[in-house]
Amino acid sequence: MADLDSPPKLSGVQQPSEGVGGGRCSEISAELIRSLTELQELEAVYERLCGEEKVVERELDALLEQQNTIESKMVTLHRMGPNLQLIEGDAKQLAGMITFTCNLAENVSSKVRQLDLAKNRLYQAIQRADDILDLKFCMDGVQTALRSEDYEQAAAHTHRYLCLDKSVIELSRQGKEGSMIDANLKLLQEAEQRLKAIVAEKFAIATKEGDLPQVERFFKIFPLLGLHEEGLRKFSEYLCKQVASKAEENLLMVLGTDMSDRRAAVIFADTLTLLFEGIARIVETHQPIVETYYGPGRLYTLIKYLQVECDRQVEKVVDKFIKQRDYHQQFRHVQNNLMRNSTTEKIEPRELDPILTEVTLMNARSELYLRFLKKRISSDFEVGDSMASEEVKQEHQKCLDKLLNNCLLSCTMQELIGLYVTMEEYFMRETVNKAVALDTYEKGQLTSSMVDDVFYIVKKCIGRALSSSSIDCLCAMINLATTELESDFRDVLCNKLRMGFPATTFQDIQRGVTSAVNIMHSSLQQGKFDTKGIESTDEAKMSFLVTLNNVEVCSENISTLKKTLESDCTKLFSQGIGGEQAQAKFDSCLSDLAAVSNKFRDLLQEGLTELNSTAIKPQVQPWINSFFSVSHNIEEEEFNDYEANDPWVQQFILNLEQQMAEFKASLSPVIYDSLTGLMTSLVAVELEKVVLKSTFNRLGGLQFDKELRSLIAYLTTVTTWTIRDKFARLSQMATILNLERVTEILDYWGPNSGPLTWRLTPAEVRQVLALRIDFRSEDIKRLRL
């Protein structure tokens, strides 16, 4: 008997899986059920069978739910049957058509290929026949032309022979007429060698005799014989001899030039110019011949040979220049002078002026010549490289850059310009120092002489560097000029401003009067009167004001110089001088120059602040403080009396007008306007302090409003600065002091303010309301602002 507390374990019977069916039979067989005798085992089997029954029922339900969908799909499939049969028939028909078309195309194309092959063979046969005929024609023509000394015609026949397809000739030699063709070839080769020897000999004779027509005649024959390089080399040698002969003639003429001659100062630049112009004429004259007879891309070879001779002649001219102008000695002298604590006697800058001008002129002519070569060679390469690969184009560009950048002409000019920059720096520094030392001021002028002199020198030096057509040279001079203006010259002006404007306070006036009385008393005892002390103060004032004008003009001059350089260099860059790197370098130099202009503006602002605090503030403060002496707690009678006899503002305006008149005559309009702006700001701040320490009644507030309006109206006429913005707080204070009652402020505050923007805080509004003696403090405190 099995244990009732534990489920029976039936051997060979597995637990049915939930939801697993799929049309399988029960795992419990009928034989197993019949063999069971225990009730508990029967119950266990029954439960399992019931579980399997539930699974089967769920599977049946799921299949029955899909019945409608499956039936509808079957109906659709039955309907598609006829259509699918039609499609099958059409597809078979289309496949047959495609197969037929493919076979037809294959047959046609094979026949076309056969036709093309036959056509090509026919052409080859015709070409072979033509070449054989040409070969015989060339042989007969060469012999006839040589006998009649018609070398051009002989060269043309030889060129035709050389252009024949060698493989065709080789095949012809294997045919029936091979022996005849061999004989013709041998005769042609002998004629070719004979013609080459004759052309070389005739060309040599023509060059020796200087017979240019004959030289050009045989020069044109070389490429017909396949001697492109030899022809260019021999012709270049002839041209180089001409260049050398003319250059030596020009140099001898230069060395014999009288120093009083008008062009004596630039004779070496003129010599180089003649050399470059001569080579340029040669290139222009013979470029069409080279392009026509030698083909595009060959001009580079001709110019390469010419440039070697040009370098030789440039070296001779520059050596004579260095020796006759004592260029290296002058440079060493300048270099010693530029060193600190140098005891060497300084060289006079005027002695360097003509040398520096000539060097820049020499470099400008060289740059122009090199740009000419670059343009000619580049255009020639472009024609020849129209169908070439990118590698070939890059290789040609490298050859061009190497020729122009590494030639002796470029290296020599770079060396001269390197020394020039140092000498130009010395010239600029010494002449600027001299201009500062000789600074003078003429009465009636706003600036002193050194400003115009210094900027004339700076413009001259930068302009001279610009005329060299070298961007590196120009950038170096701009940087040196920037340093000179920023450091040395600005320091001169800064030191003058640091001396300050002589104070004009009441105590200073008292001391001045006492000193003047003592000087007069002493002078009267000695029988003379010395005004040096008084004059020195006036001179110090004028010096300060003139320095301010100088600073302002310097800033403007630097900005103008920057714009001028931008315009001038735009023309240079448009001519192909420099590239993107040179443009970026130049822009950086101009940015540094513009920064110096801003530094001069900052210095001007410092000077104006000093003038305002020293000359204006000590005077304005007592005039504003006199506001305290005028009561603004007045009755109707006093208000009317103030109307007729203004107690304060008219005298204050008169004092301001008299004080500013002194500066108006001595300062530039821009500086005077800036100073007036500082003065108005000072008046607004100081008057606000005084008002907040005063008391008012209703009529007193009205009187203050009239005074403020008169003051604003006057200041508006003397400056272009916005006055009302500076006096906005005072105007709002006057509005508050004009109120009839405390709560009236709410008509102007918050949502009721309209376009008015309040500059006063709520605490400041209460503070101003408290200045009215007729307003109760309790009412002011109750305000909700």
Curated annotation (Swiss-Prot):
Gene: COG4
Annotated stretches, region: D domain: 618-740
Residue ranges, annotated region (E domain): 741-785
Signal peptide range: none
Record bears the keyword Nucleotide-binding: no
Bilayer topology annotation: Peripheral membrane protein
Region of interest (Disordered), residue spans: 1-24
Region (Interaction with STX5): 85-153
Name of protein: Conserved oligomeric Golgi complex subunit 4
Modified residues (Phosphoserine): S6
Known outcome of mutating G512R: In SWILS; delayed anterograde vesicular trafficking from the ER to the Golgi and accelerated retrograde vesicular recycling from the Golgi to the ER, leading to a decrease in Golgi volume, as well as morphologic abnormalities with collapse of the Golgi stacks in affected fibroblasts; altered decorin/DCN Golgi-dependent glycosylation; no effect on protein expression
Location relative to the cell: Cytoplasm, Cytosol; Golgi apparatus membrane
